Amino acid sequence: MCSMDINRIRHILLDQGFRGCIQISNNKQPVFAQAYGYSDFPNQIPNTLETKFATASAGKVFVAVSILQLVENGKLRLQDTLGNILPLDWHKIDANITVEQLLMHTSGIPDYFDESVMSEYEDLWKDFPNYRIRTNADLCPLFLYKPMMYPHGTKFQYNNTGFVVLAMMIEAVTNQPFDICLQSNIFSPCGMNSTGYYEMDSLPAKCANSYIFEKARDRFRTNIYSVDAKGTGAGGAFTTVGDIEKFWNALLSYKLIPRKATSEMLRCHSGNKEAGYYGYGIWLEPTDSGYSPYFQGRDPGVSFISFYEPSENATITLVSNYGDNVWKLLRSIRECISGK
């Protein structure tokens, strides 16, 4: 990537008023990393490359890796069922849903936040206070008594409940909170020292506040009453752009799971042209030579995407604590990198 490319990328970010952090790496080496905007808007404290950002659904990829690690260690099988691993009263939910179906969003399990019906995550908390959500099990009342969305294994539909249940499986098999398991088996081995799941009312140092703009009142407010009090298997990890690069490097060099398991994770298992294509816990963009993997997340005041471009051996990570359109920025940056 030449200096002209980097200058053009800077102009793209400034022209679109980006607020957050970006890191672009080529051959595992950062070639551009920059922070914009404020982590604390009223006090004008700027974002930095050390700022920890909320990432919404991006955390599903960590849960998927953890599940595949347990499979490799013989503690789980992809064909294990919901009822087998979590022997609860599942009411109208089919206990024969498999681990694999949960991983690739074909389970049909009722979604506590069905993105095909609901547009705003904060609407969930009108009748159920968000401050109660501090574990995966805390979300059970929001889906446990609902009927199946469709027979398991018959279609692809992105589903948040599925990854909450996968995290509950991790907890059942390891006998520890899922975030502690992820810390021990993913974050620490990768050197991701600024990544974790934190309670919104006791955030550690260097965490960015996430802001929602209220047009009617012409002001920003934080999202503390709009998201879970602590992240779950569905998402909610805090991280830095540098830590995400460490994750990609470890994943793609088979330090987290073996080559065969990594290939299966990054292989297309479900999805379609309209909804998108999916591996295990990761999105896939079709290319002439295969697929480019990426993971992403959106919550009120939060937007995140991290994309791997195999043809360039490059990663691009964008995260905003103002919900900026990181997808539009990514398209512009990819065009810049490809020389279009």
Question: Predicted segment positions?
Answer:
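A short acidic/small-residue loop/turn micro-motif
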Residues: 38-41, 228, 323-324
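Short, well-ordered beta-strand elements
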Residues: 31, 304-322
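Short, surface-exposed loop or secondary-structure junction motifs
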Residues: 93-298
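Short beta-strand scaffold segments in enzyme catalytic cores
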Residues: 21-24, 281-283, 306
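Short, conserved catalytic-motif segment at the N-terminal edge
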Residues: 2-55
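Catalytic tyrosine of NAD(P)H-dependent dehydrogenase/reductases that use a Tyr as the general acid/base
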Residues: 53-56, 156-158
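Short, gly/Ser/Thr-rich active-site loops of penicillin-recognizing serine hydrolases
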Residues: 30, 287-288, 324-340
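Active-site SXXK
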Residues: 28, 54-82, 166-171, 244, ...
